[in-house]
Amino acid sequence: MFCKRLIQLRKSALPLAMAAVIFAGTSIALSSTTAAATAVSSSSGVWPGVGKICEPGPGGASSVRGVGDKTINIAVFNDASNTITPGLEVEFPEQATAFADWCNAAGGIDGRKIVIDNRDAALFNAAQQTTAACQIDFMAVGGGMALDQPAVPIREKCGLGQITGYVVSNASVLASDQVDPGGGNTDSITAGYFGALTKAYPKAVKAAGMGAGDTPSVLQPETKAEFAAEAQGWKVVDFLEPPVSVENWAPYVEQYQQKGVTALWPADDSNFTPFAQAMTTAGYHPAFVLLGTQFDNTQTQKDVADNPSLPPVYIETGWWPLAQASQNPSTEELVTIMHKYAKGDPIDFDDEEGAESWLLWAKAASACGASNLTVTCVLNHAAATTNWDAGGIQAPIASLTLSNENPQPSPCFAMLKVEAKGIVYDKALTHPTQSIWNCNPKNVIQLTAAQQAEINAL
């Protein structure tokens, strides 16, 4: 979804606590990454801010793959069974199942019930799982695979349409038969958060450290982020390329320290715990640490609490903070449905990614009607959507389009600060212009042809 999307080798096994939203000064204290929803989940098929997307109907026989008289088979890609980080993206099938149960209770898509096919690539089986989906599934919705590049030609060849949870590699970002609800492309990136930190830490960003796992699917978006940071005033003095799986972060932390890095976007795009511990052990104190949105969870909060010598730790996000769910009816509905249909499952931003994809898909599929439910129809309706924010779950996007027709990302972002007692919305750092978001065309960085060529060569 985010055009700088990373491998998300991080999952917290901690149960998510009830959250309280406390307004004080310029920040909103979030005691957890989830909230108790106070609204009663509707069984009418109406989603707040999106409208009626599920309802009874005639269904009917169809010659379209994956579409039956009373059912629609949908693939949900993930990497949950991998042995490097077990449980990776397990939220995607969990959220998909919860959404399907909610939608089916309201009558389904014009009378057809959604059937979820869990397509678990376990990191290294993207091609095999896509091949399996090509046999029986109508479309792929609300999922993603960290190493997605091998899946692209297979999916395109069989015409498996996709409304993705997220994409990583350039090949996947630009793929056909796909709508990305986040508007990702390869020649631009929403990066206003780098600029926000440039204003707050003008000296520190002149010695920045970044990095990415040594595989094209991750190097490409992170190199894109490097170019964007430099366009926003950062000077990158060290860019590390560790292997995808790192057991000991001490040597990498020491290299950042030796290079005098004072503004840090870590090469660790997985679990922050060992990286934070390595920083504490080394006595490394840059001016701040900036993390991607995938770190917005209780484990990161615990890491900060367990390592009190860490500098300020920030998270950039384009998703409504789950702990503020009560402030946004669409997010509150998501949390309510997860509590009802996926009891005990932790909720994090992956659930939001999945949800906004499912909401777009259901809205488009319902618009097609029972007799015209085809991949082309669904994608055309999704691609024609304007002012999309999934009812407020994600930062707003003016218009969507097919992924191979130059979509544009949202110009909006928000900043969170990780503190020992909670993750707080940092209003002062965000400088919001619209709701909680900082929305400005200048937040979107356009890459040069030379930069794009360098990324494509990785």
Model-predicted segments: where are they?
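N-terminal secretory signal peptides that target proteins for export/translocation
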Residues: 1-9
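Sec-dependent N-terminal signal peptides
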Residues: 10-26
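Beta-alpha junction/loop-to-helix N-cap segments that form part of ligand/metal-binding clefts
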Residues: 12, 87-94, 105-176, 242-249
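C-terminal region of N-terminal signal peptides and the immediate post-cleavage residues
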Residues: 23-46
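N-terminal extracellular/periplasmic Venus flytrap/periplasmic-binding protein-like
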Residues: 38-133
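Extracytoplasmic ligand/sensor domains, especially the bilobed periplasmic-binding protein
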Residues: 137-240, 288-314
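Extracellular/periplasmic periplasmic-binding protein-like sensory domains
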Residues: 183, 279-356, 436, 440-443, ...
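Segments of small-molecule ligand-sensing domains
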Residues: 340-351, 362-425
